[in-house]
């Protein structure tokens, strides 16, 4: 997820979208008592500054098992930032998959969702 979001931010003229599955948006192994970190805030600001609102398609998701259990708060902050910045549902999609983990088997099981979103005509 991180490398896909970076590719879109860095080369928006090349990549028209990004599928960010189980994005490690905490950028570290977080302290669960910490509500927001400087690294998480910097990642959100980077996204906000480098991807034109509704200028590409951006898909993000996560589960709630293994590493993904740490992403819920950070992902909620990203979702808030995206919607407050004006992203619409044609260009930004977030999905939550309860009971799924940060692993290839779970990503494979839901790969159709980001692909259909990214490849759909506007």
Regions found by a protein language model. Give the residues of each.
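Non-catalytic cap/lid and distal C-terminal segments of serine-dependent acyl enzymes
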Residues: 1-122
